[in-house]
A protein has these predicted regions:
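Conserved short alpha-helical segments that host acidic/polar catalytic motifs at enzyme active sites
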Residues: 1-342
């Protein structure tokens, strides 16, 4: 799983994005991290194996120009720097990040076939490796590839076909669905962020002349907001500093389990019991797994977990601390936020 943040507004995006990622990478990130911004019709990006501090130390991430951008950090898997987000299209016009899994669409979403088709069309997939990476597509030519990079290049093809970015994002998830949320920026739209959300979490906060998105509201800066909202599931969004365009129902046939007041109360009770019974602090993944219900559709356990955790932190009933675990390579460590009952 992963953490994502985005910003568009009237300030330099990079420092804001880095601050937001520091606030959330310990939930489900810290092993691969990257950032992308737009300025003067050009997409800039930087990425590393490591956490956000590694990104700042080893790249010019803090100095990337532009007032619109996205940032991403994720859990360990395998692969080198090319397995970090963002993924960038061959023409350099699109940067794409994603959070999620193929999940229940594994039998219908054929990323190996899509990847081979892209290769035939001349696309260069930089994440291709002869190493076998567990949980990621293995291609007929014996290589493994990050399916999110395949998504990025499929998005590029959809844009070449004449679709506008918002429509292209919808078509991407409609034709190659995953249990995920995808976010993109496009060089020709320097003041917009495009998102397509099936079930993984995405929240939106607004201030005067600014819009922020994040995996969890716990990542938002400490400032006054006009409003903070969860972006509804199974929909696509064009986000600007002063507006929001929506395409509902990426796929009307897909049912995402709603988070009703009753579901939230049950999750709050279950997480409370889990934390009270725990003999030592637990990572956020334990909170999220406790929220893996109801049945009968695609769950929103990550979003539900973040909403419950936010409630518990605000009430002062839990404490969040940070430990560091071994990173992807020797000498690197990753932050992990640990939750405990007071």
């Amino acid at each position: 799983m992963c953490n994502i943040a985005g910003y568009t507004g009237n300030r330099q995006a990079a420092p804001i994005l880095i601050d937001m990622m520091r606030r959330e990478e310990g939930y489900w990130g810290g092993y691969y991290t990257g950032i992308a911004t737009i300025d003067n019709g050009r997409v800039y990006h930087a990425k590393v194996v490591g956490d956000v501090e590694t990104l700042v130390r080893e790249t010019d991430a803090l100095r990337l120009p532009g007032t619109t951008g996205i940032i991403h950090s994720r859990t360990p898997s395998g692969g080198d720097r090319e397995w970090a987000y963002p993924f960038v299209s061959c023409d350099g016009k699109v940067a794409f990040v994603e959070n999620g899994i193929i999940g229940s669409f594994e039998k219908t979403t054929d990323f190996p076939a899509a990847a081979m088709d892209l290769k035939k069309k001349g696309h260069k997939l930089s994440s291709c490796t002869t190493d076998e990476i567990k949980g990621y597509p293995r291609l007929p030519d014996g290589t493994s590839v990050h399916y999110s990079e395949v998504q990025c290049h499929l998005l590029e093809e959809l844009l070449y076909s004449g679709l506008q970015p918002l429509e292209a994002m919808r078509e991407l998830l409609r034709r190659w669905p995953c249990e995920d949320v995808g976010v993109a920026i496009h060089h020709a739209h320097p003041n917009k962020i495009f998102a397509a959300r099936f079930n993984q979490p995405m929240t939106l906060a607004r201030a005067k002349g600014e819009a922020f998105i994040s995996t969890t509201p716990l990542a938002f800066p400490e400032q006054d907001f006009i409003g903070v909202d969860v972006l509804p599931a199974n929909a696509c969004y064009e986000i600007s500093a002063n507006g929001l365009s929506v395409i509902n129902a990426i796929d009307p046939a897909v049912r995402v389990c709603p988070i009703t007041p009753a579901v939230f109360v049950q999750a709050l009770q279950d997480v409370t019991a889990k934390l009270q019974a725990a003999k030592e602090p637990v990572p956020f993944s334990v909170v999220a797994e406790t929220c893996k219900f109801p049945q009968g559709g695609i769950p929103q356990m990550a979003l539900l977990g973040y909403l419950v955790l936010e409630s518990l932190l605000k009430s002062g009933k839990v404490v969040q601390t940070t430990i560091r675990k071994d990173g992807m390579t020797a000498g690197l460590t990753a932050p992990v936020f640990m939750i405990s009952w007071k």
